[in-house]
Regions:
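C-terminal motif of bacterial Sec signal peptides marking the signal peptidase cleavage site
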Residues: 14-17
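Sec-dependent signal peptide recognition
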Residues: 2-9
Length: 216
């Protein structure tokens, strides 16, 4: 019987190895893999309930896709905090496993990209990209400059106002302007232009979406 012991041991090792391979085929665990998304939910106005309300939206959407164990923050600047200082240090992957940026410097040096700036389920945001559905919704609320700092006067009173006399700075998730233009600030994912007003996020190509980042 002793001569069979090594064979039995080898079989046990092989069985464990096969079990590990099977586990690896189940795909990434979203509780740690997902680190960035454009919110699938929208807002008709710039009143998001302040930073707390926006963060809560990010946390809820992340939880719905199995990533709620991470701490999520909205990429929004206010009079008291810059968006870049709220989102951790990276790296950040999207729902499809692609790296959006490895760190803050890389993040703020890049432009929008329809294939990377997707929602929490990996779906592209309607924009100016070829074949996009209508309506255009690539204007994402940020209230920020291109380097992630507050754009004074363009934060809808720190995301608590739906006033027609105020506006918000937005970025283009796809990095494109009309007719797929990439001139001027149009490619900016976080600071392309100001929207029409805080009373209505739809004109000019918006729907009140926000960017969400995992800070841990």
């Amino acid at each position: 019987m002793k001569m069979y012991i090594p064979l039995l041991a080898l079989a046990a090792v092989m069985a464990v190895g096969c079990g590990d391979d099977d586990d690896g085929m189940t795909g990434p665990d979203n509780s740690t893999a997902l680190g960035f998304f454009v919110s699938s939910s929208t807002s008709a106005t710039g009143n998001l309930g302040g930073l707390a309300g926006a963060d809560g939206r990010c946390q809820g959407l992340a939880a719905a896709v199995g990533a709620g164990s991470r701490t999520w923050r909205a990429y929004l600047s206010t009079s008291s905090v810059n968006a870049r200082d709220r989102i951790g240090s990276g790296p950040w992957r999207n729902a499809n496993g692609a790296v959006v940026a490895n760190n803050l410097t890389e993040l703020h040096a890049r432009t929008g990209d329809a294939a990377l700036f997707v929602d929490e389920r990996g779906t592209r945001i309607n924009g100016q990209w070829s074949g996009s559905p209508s309506p255009v919704q690539h204007d994402v609320l940020t209230g920020s400059t291109a380097d992630g700092r507050v754009m004074a006067g363009l934060t809808c009173s720190d995301w608590t106002s739906a006033s027609a006399s105020e506006a918000a700075q937005v970025g283009h998730s796809d990095g494109l302007g009309p007719n797929m233009s990439t001139t001027g600030s149009l490619p900016s994912w976080n600071s392309a232009h100001a929207n029409e007003s805080c009373a209505n996020t739809a004109p000019r190509g918006g729907s009140g979406r926000i960017y969400c980042f995992a800070v841990n």
